[in-house]
């Protein structure tokens, strides 16, 4: 009982020393400012490059901790009297460790509101946030125990601070050594295993991995145990042979637990969309495997040493293979067996190059991360994968095709005079990567109509300005003959996207007239929305001084004619549209017409000016910024619709009762040039995800669509509605994090210091 009271008194004294010492508040402010500035300013959060992915947020914590944690663990004057305290060495060490961990935990808690500010602009994954925070506590426990160990070894606080910081720097950056230096596999695996960043990778994605949990707990215990031994030795204690045996045994068991944490493990997926978990559809699909299904993962060891997410792929494949006794899983390393490279080449798989730097020289390694699937004598491949975000979909679609011998076919046509090799050059590779077989239809081919009649499957059309009446008749006949559903991207206007963005009226609108016959109408307006994409403009000012460099200026403008649609039922991540036209629905339509894409409630229109046929509306971003839109009527508007049920022909006498057609009023939404404009540093491919989801839906593969769309968690800043609101929340965020939070920390420190002084005056 007396020992417990003494322990509580020491713990309380340590906490009082920490919370009344200026260094604690200095490092607290430094910690919070570094994380905030790194994420919100250095990463360009407010400059069009922002993302709500907390992976970037957490990544800065280990680096600032190199200085912060040794500062927290710095020995104050009161620690000099520890040897005179009637308390066991373990409790003395543990009291210092626990008080430091409490201080660090408070620092970590300060990060929660810092992360929640992201919700002003986009959606954060709460599971990712709290699993990340929990593992930061474990990480703090681990590095504090290391600092405690060096505090006991070195008498000088300055020396222990420097050594602790150096050791933490090594542990935090260990995984980078294998990037810049060449090591054997054993040494590389060891370096990877001791890396803190490597063990935090899963947690930063919202996964509770018992291997990482055991690593942090076991490492904390080992260094605390060593600290106690050091304290006992410094007191002059001589251990008996039995005690030495016990110490060696405890230390050995701890090391074995640490090293064997990888043997038996569990992973719990707390991410919002359960990206790293097997879905019900996959479990049901696996029940159809009646023969041997082999999964062979060709993974270069040089690649797995460098990227922790490669471990996720192996784990997911192991879970996948456990679904059915007929599934077998094997890993092969092309780095160890050079003949495997030839095997992969026979499958049409080539290596990917990876750059490494060794002894001031740059080398390029050929690496593989490929999956070969074999079922009933048939083979298919996933050529290269680096994460599990789309792995379940990739496996399911290939397994489904092998079991049911049914391919996904999409017939694609550029009806606006553009082509798939320059203007839509991402479309075919993207479709192929998602398991679709593309059948290109060419209007310039004299056999276009015959080729269309021979085809079957979903029809994907971009624009109709070059589609003549004969071609329109053939397309309508294709739809009415139930050969396949259709995804029509139509707009009665064309834009000179590669020059001045001027808008002109199309001379041919045969498909427009066809779909208007089915109960929808394209209005003579262009949609504008304050919730829109941003354009980054660059200008260079030449200097008069020949010895100075020219100045480059960057300006980011909201461009309301590129409406950014928020996530909705048919677009899980949202969509960016380019010069879209509002669609209205006729009440007397015989088919079922349902809106699938709508704008924000603040969207408005620019009316078409037919008196200026060369430029029907103003499209210059600088001129648009000057226009006062306060008097324009604001409302949600329809950009896309689904037609289903009965359809009757405009050009043909035929009809169908089971149509399923998607129509959006934007022919450029997957155009290569437009994708480049909105891509930013991280790439914005939401439009392509939307395209794949709808093609899967139209191909009667709604289960696969649900697998594909579950990974489409929108990490963009889609909640922004207008520039004024964006700037307002930007100011609130920066003022709160850079000024208000530090001031609150200072006020807390001053109040505790005053309280201590008052207390001392009454003694």
Kindly label every feature range from the protein language model.
Residues 1-25:
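Aromatic- and glycine-rich beta-strand/loop motifs that create alpha-glucan
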Residues 197, 237-294, 401-407, 521, ...:
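Extracellular ligand-binding/catalytic regions of CAZymes and related secreted enzymes
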Residues 4, 42-46, 51, 160-235, ...:
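Terminal transmembrane helical anchor/hairpin motif
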Residues 56-79, 107:
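Long, hydrophobic alpha-helical segments
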Residues 259, 263-472:
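Juxtamembrane extramembrane loops of integral membrane proteins
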Residues 404, 420-703:
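Acidic, S/T/G-rich, low-cysteine, solvent-exposed domains in lumenal/extracellular/periplasmic regions
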Residues 36-40, 94-158:
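Secretory targeting signals
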Residues 75-101, 480-483:
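Helix-loop-helix units of permease transmembrane domains in multi-pass membrane transporters
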């Amino acid at each position: 009982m007396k020992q417990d009271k003494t322990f509580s008194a020491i713990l309380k004294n340590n906490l009082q020393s920490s919370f009344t010492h200026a260094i604690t508040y200095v490092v607290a402010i430094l910690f919070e400012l570094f994380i905030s500035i790194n994420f919100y300013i250095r990463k360009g959060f407010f400059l069009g490059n922002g993302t709500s992915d907390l992976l970037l947020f957490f990544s800065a914590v280990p680096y600032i901790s190199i200085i912060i944690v040794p500062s927290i663990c710095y020995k104050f004057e009161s620690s000099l009297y520890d040897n005179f305290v009637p308390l066991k060495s373990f409790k003395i060490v543990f009291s210092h460790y626990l008080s430091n961990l409490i201080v660090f935990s408070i620092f970590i808690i300060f990060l929660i509101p810092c992360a929640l500010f992201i919700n002003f602009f986009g959606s954060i994954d709460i599971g990712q946030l709290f699993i990340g925070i929990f593992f930061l506590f474990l990480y703090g426990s681990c590095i504090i125990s290391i600092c405690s160990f060096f505090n006991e070894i070195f008498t000088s606080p300055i020396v222990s601070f420097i050594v602790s910081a150096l050791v933490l720097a090594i542990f935090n950056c260990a995984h980078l050594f294998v990037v810049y230096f060449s090591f054997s596999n054993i040494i590389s695996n060891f370096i990877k295993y001791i890396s803190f960043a490597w063990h935090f990778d899963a947690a930063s994605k919202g996964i509770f991995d018992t291997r990482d949990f055991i690593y942090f707990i076991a490492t904390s215990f080992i260094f605390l145990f060593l600290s106690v031994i050091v304290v006992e030795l410094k007191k002059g204690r001589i251990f008996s042979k039995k005690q030495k045996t016990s110490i060696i045994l405890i230390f050995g068991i701890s090391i074995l637990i640490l090293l064997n944490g990888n043997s038996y493990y569990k992973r719990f997926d707390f991410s919002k969309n359960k990206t790293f978990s097997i879905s019900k559809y996959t479990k049901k699909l696996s029940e159809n495997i009646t023969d041997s299904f082999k999964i062979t993962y060709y993974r270069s060891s040089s690649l797995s040493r460098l990227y922790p997410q490669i471990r996720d792929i192996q784990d997911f494949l192991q879970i996948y293979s456990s679904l059915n006794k007929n599934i077998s899983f094997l890993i092969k390393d092309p780095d160890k067996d050079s003949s495997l490279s030839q095997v992969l080449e026979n499958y049409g798989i080539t290596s990917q190059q990876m750059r490494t730097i060794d002894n001031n020289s740059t080398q390029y390694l050929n690496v593989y991360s490929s999956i070969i699937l074999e079922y009933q004598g048939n083979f298919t491949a996933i050529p290269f994968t680096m994460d599990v975000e789309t792995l379940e979909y990739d496996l399911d679609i290939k397994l489904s095709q092998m079991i049911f011998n049914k391919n996904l076919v999409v017939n694609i046509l550029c009806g606006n005079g553009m082509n798939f090799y320059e203007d839509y050059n991402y479309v075919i590779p993207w479709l192929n990567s998602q398991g679709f077989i593309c059948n290109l239809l060419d209007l310039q081919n004299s056999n276009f109509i015959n080729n269309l009649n021979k085809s079957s499957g979903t029809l994907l059309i971009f624009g109709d300005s070059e589609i003549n009446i004969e071609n329109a008749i053939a397309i309508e006949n294709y739809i009415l003959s139930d050969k396949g559903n259709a995804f029509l991207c139509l707009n009665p206007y064309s834009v000179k996207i590669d020059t001045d963005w001027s808008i002109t009226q199309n001379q041919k609108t045969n498909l427009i007239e066809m779909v208007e016959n089915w109960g929808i109408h394209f209005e003579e307006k262009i949609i504008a929305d304050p919730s829109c994409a941003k354009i980054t403009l660059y200008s260079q000012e030449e200097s008069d001084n020949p010895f100075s460099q020219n100045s480059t200026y960057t300006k980011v403008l909201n461009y309301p004619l590129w409406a950014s649609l928020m996530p909705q039922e048919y677009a899980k991540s949202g969509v960016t549209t380019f010069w879209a036209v509002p669609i209205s629905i006729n009440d007397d339509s015989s088919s079922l017409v349902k809106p699938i894409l709508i704008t924000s409630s603040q969207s408005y229109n620019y009316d078409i000016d037919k008196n200026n046929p060369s430029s029907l509306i103003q499209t210059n971003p600088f001129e648009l910024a000057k226009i006062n839109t306060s008097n324009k009527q604001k409302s949600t508007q329809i950009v896309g619709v689904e037609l289903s049920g009965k359809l009757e022909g405009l050009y043909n006498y035929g009809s169908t009762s089971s149509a399923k057609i998607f129509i959006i009023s934007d022919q450029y939404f997957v155009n290569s040039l437009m994708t480049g404009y909105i891509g930013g540093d991280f790439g914005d491919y939401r439009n392509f995800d939307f395209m794949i989801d709808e093609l899967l839906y139209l191909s009667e593969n709604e289960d696969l669509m649900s697998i594909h769309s579950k990974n489409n968690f929108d990490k963009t800043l889609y909640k922004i509605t207008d520039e004024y609101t964006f700037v307002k929340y930007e100011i609130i965020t920066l003022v709160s994090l850079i000024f208000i939070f530090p001031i609150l920390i200072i006020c807390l420190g001053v109040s505790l210091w005053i309280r201590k002084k008052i207390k001392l005056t009454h003694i």
